[in-house]
C-alpha cells in the first residue's frame, strides 16, 4: 500500500474497545475512529541542529534500550505499549491513570518506558516524603500534646477577678520577758507565734473598694502565711471584680507596739484570692510615710473543651475541681506544694508546724519538735530537691504582673481618701492597688492537634507533594472496588443469559423434535 491513498483506496477505520457496560445499545450511535495521516510539517532550525549533532539519534537509541530493558513482573505497567492505543485492550490501571486527578499518573499511559520509569521514581519519592512529614507531625503532636496561644488582647478587666491584696509588717512586739517564756517551756509553739505576732488589720484605718464611699474594713481578715507571718488580707477566698479603680488603704502604725523603728514599712503581696501567700509570692516593699500606687496587669489563662478529652499525663495540668485540697475547694499549685511539705514533715517528725495546712487528726509540733522541723528544711535545702507530690500547675488561672510608684508623703496635701481633720500623719502609709488598663490579655490552652487539624495537615502535605484530595481517594476506591465489582456482575449476568438462552434453545429443540 502506498503512503498516499488513492481515490479508490478504502478508508482505514479503527473500532473502539468499549467495556461491556459502556457499550452503546444502539449501533447507530457507534462512531468509528478514522486514522488521519499526519501532515508533513516543516522542520525547525532546532530540529535540524539537534539532528546535525546526532542528539536525536542518541536519544532514540537510549529510548529503544529502555524499551528492551527487562523489568520485573510487578513493574510491567512501566513498559511502553507497542501499539497506538486503539487495537490493544486497555487494562484497568491504564484507564485509572488516564482519569486520575493525582499529578503524574497520566504519564503511565502513552509515554515511553524511560519516561514512565522517571515519573514512577518521582511519585515514589513524593509518597515517601509526604508520609515522612505526616509521621513527623504525629510525633510532634505526641511529644507536645497541648499548646498555649493568645486568644485575645482585648479582654475587659471588669471580667477578670481582682487579686487578693495581703499586707504584712516588718515590726514585732517588744516582749521583755519573751526569753523567760521560752525557758519556762510553759508556752507552746503556737501560743508563742500568736503572742509575738503584730496584728496588721487594726493598723488599717481606711479601706475603700472601687473608689466607693463604702468602708471595706469589714472585708479584711487576718491570715497566716506559709512562712508563719501574721498578715492582713483583702479579697481572700472571695471573688470581686473591678474595672480599674481598685482598692485603697491608709495604714497608721501604733507607736506603743513598735519595737524601735517608726518607718520600717510594710510589704504588699499580690496573689490569687484562693492562694495562701508564701515566701515566693510577688510583693512590693512600701516604706513608712509614703504613698504607693501599685498598677496591675492581669493575664488570664483558660482552656478549651478539647482539653477534657486528654489524660492527665498528656495535658500536664489539673482542672479546678479535679484534685481535692485541704486549704480550698479550688486547686492551686502553691497550696498543693504546701500540703505536700506538711505531709512530709508529719511523716518525718510525727507532727506539723503551727499555722500549716492541717487535718483534724494531725498533731501540732511543740517547741521540743522545732529542731526536727528545722533539720527537715535544712536537709531539703542541701539536697536541692523538693517532692512535688504530682502538684501540677492548674489548667485555668490568673497571673498578675505589676509596677509600683512610691512617693514620700511628707509635705503632701491629704487626698480624698484621708480625713481632712488635723491628725498626725506620723508613720502613715497610703496604698492603692488598681488595674493600669481597661483591657487584658487572655491566653488559651488547647490540644496541639485534633482530628480536624490532622485532616488539614494530612491534606496539605499530600496535596503539596502528590496533588491528592478527597476526589483522588474516591477515584481510587471506585477503580479498585466499585468498577471491578460492576465488571464481575456484568460478566456474571452475560454468562447467566447465555446459559438461559442455551436452556431455552435445548427445550425448544426437544419440544419440536417429536412433532417433526
From Swiss-Prot:
One annotated Gene Ontology cellular component of this protein: membrane
Bilayer-crossing regions: 117-137, 454-474
Cited InterPro entries: ENaC, ENaC_CS
Superkingdom of source: Eukaryota
Tissue: Expressed in embryonic and larval tracheal systems in the dorsal trunk and transverse connective (TC), but not in the junction between the dorsal trunk and TC, and in several tracheal branches and terminal cells. In larvae, also expressed in ventral pits. Expressed in the taste-sensing terminal organ of the larval head. In adult, expressed in hairs on the tibia, femur, tarsi of the leg and wing margin.
Keywords: Ion channel, Ion transport, Membrane, Sodium, Sodium channel, Sodium transport, Transmembrane, Transmembrane helix, Transport
Primary residence: membrane
PROSITE patterns to which the protein is assigned, alphabetical: ASC (PS01206)
Record-linked Pfam families: ASC
Keyword hit for Ion transport: yes
UniProt subcellular location: Membrane
PANTHER family: AMILORIDE-SENSITIVE SODIUM CHANNEL-RELATED, PICKPOCKET 16-RELATED
Function: Part of a complex that plays a role in tracheal liquid clearance. In both larvae and adults, contributes to the behavioral response to salt. Probable role in sodium transport.
UniProt family annotation: Belongs to the amiloride-sensitive sodium channel (TC 1.A.6) family.
Protein's recorded name: Pickpocket protein 11
Organism of provenance: Drosophila melanogaster (Fruit fly)
Amino acid at each position: 500500500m502506498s503512503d498516499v491513498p488513492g481515490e479508490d483506496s478504502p478508508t482505514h477505520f479503527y473500532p473502539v474497545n468499549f467495556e461491556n457496560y459502556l457499550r452503546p445499545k444502539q449501533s447507530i450511535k457507534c462512531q468509528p475512529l478514522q486514522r488521519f495521516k499526519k501532515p508533513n510539517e516543516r522542520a525547525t532550525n532546532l530540529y535540524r541542529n539537534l539532528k546535525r549533532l546526532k542528539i536525536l539519534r542518541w536519544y532514540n537509541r537510549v529510548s529503544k534500550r529502555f524499551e528492551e530493558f527487562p523489568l520485573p513482573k510487578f513493574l510491567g505497567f512501566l513498559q511502553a505499549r507497542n501499539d497506538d492505543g486503539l487495537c490493544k485492550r486497555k487494562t484497568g490501571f491504564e484507564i485509572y491513570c488516564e482519569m486520575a486527578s493525582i499529578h503524574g499518573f497520566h504519564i503511565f499511559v502513552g509515554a515511553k518506558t524511560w519516561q514512565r520509569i522517571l515519573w514512577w521514581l518521582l511519585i515514589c519519592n513524593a509518597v515517601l516524603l509526604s508520609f515522612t512529614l505526616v509521621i513527623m507531625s504525629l510525633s510532634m503532636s505526641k511529644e507536645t500534646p497541648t499548646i498555649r496561644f493568645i486568644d485575645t488582647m482585648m479582654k475587659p478587666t471588669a471580667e477578670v477577678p481582682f487579686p487578693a491584696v495581703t499586707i504584712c509588717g516588718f515590726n514585732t512586739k517588744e516582749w521583755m520577758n519573751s526569753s523567760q517564756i521560752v525557758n519556762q517551756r510553759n508556752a507552746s509553739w503556737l501560743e508563742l507565734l500568736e503572742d509575738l505576732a503584730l496584728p496588721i488589720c487594726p493598723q488599717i484605718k481606711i479601706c475603700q473598694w472601687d473608689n466607693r464611699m463604702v468602708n471595706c474594713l469589714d472585708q479584711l481578715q487576718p491570715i497566716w502565711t506559709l512562712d508563719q507571718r501574721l498578715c492582713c488580707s483583702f479579697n481572700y477566698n472571695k471573688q470581686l471584680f473591678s474595672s480599674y479603680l481598685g482598692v485603697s488603704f491608709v495604714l497608721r502604725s501604733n507607736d506603743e507596739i513598735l519595737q524601735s523603728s517608726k518607718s520600717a514599712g510594710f510589704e504588699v503581696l499580690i496573689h490569687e484570692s484562693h492562694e495562701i501567700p508564701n515566701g515566693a509570692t510577688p510583693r512590693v516593699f512600701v516604706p513608712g510615710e509614703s504613698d504607693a500606687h501599685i498598677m496591675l496587669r492581669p493575664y488570664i489563662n483558660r482552656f478549651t473543651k478539647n482539653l477534657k478529652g486528654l489524660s492527665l499525663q498528656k495535658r500536664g495540668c489539673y482542672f479546678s475541681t479535679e484534685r481535692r485540697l485541704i486549704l480550698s475547694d479550688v486547686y492551686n499549685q502553691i497550696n498543693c506544694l504546701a500540703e505536700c511539705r506538711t505531709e512530709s514533715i508529719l511523716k518525718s517528725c510525727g507532727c506539723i508546724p503551727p499555722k500549716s495546712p492541717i487535718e483534724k487528726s494531725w498533731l501540732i509540733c511543740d517547741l521540743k519538735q522545732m529542731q526536727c522541723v528545722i533539720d527537715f528544711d535544712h536537709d531539703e535545702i542541701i539536697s536541692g530537691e523538693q517532692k512535688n507530690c504530682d502538684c501540677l500547675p492548674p489548667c485555668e488561672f490568673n497571673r498578675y504582673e505589676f509596677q509600683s510608684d512610691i512617693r514620700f508623703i511628707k509635705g503632701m496635701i491629704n487626698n480624698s481618701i484621708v480625713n481632712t481633720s488635723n491628725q498626725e500623719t506620723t508613720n502613715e502609709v497610703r496604698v492603692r492597688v488598681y488595674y493600669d488598663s481597661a483591657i487584658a490579655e487572655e491566653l488559651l490552652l488547647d490540644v496541639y492537634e485534633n482530628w480536624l487539624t490532622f485532616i488539614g495537615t494530612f491534606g496539605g502535605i499530600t496535596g503539596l507533594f502528590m496533588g491528592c484530595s478527597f476526589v483522588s481517594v474516591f477515584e481510587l476506591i471506585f477503580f479498585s472496588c466499585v468498577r471491578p465489582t460492576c465488571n464481575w456482575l456484568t460478566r456474571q449476568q452475560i454468562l447467566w443469559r447465555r446459559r438461559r438462552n442455551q436452556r431455552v434453545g435445548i427445550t425448544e429443540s426437544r419440544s419440536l423434535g417429536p412433532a417433526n
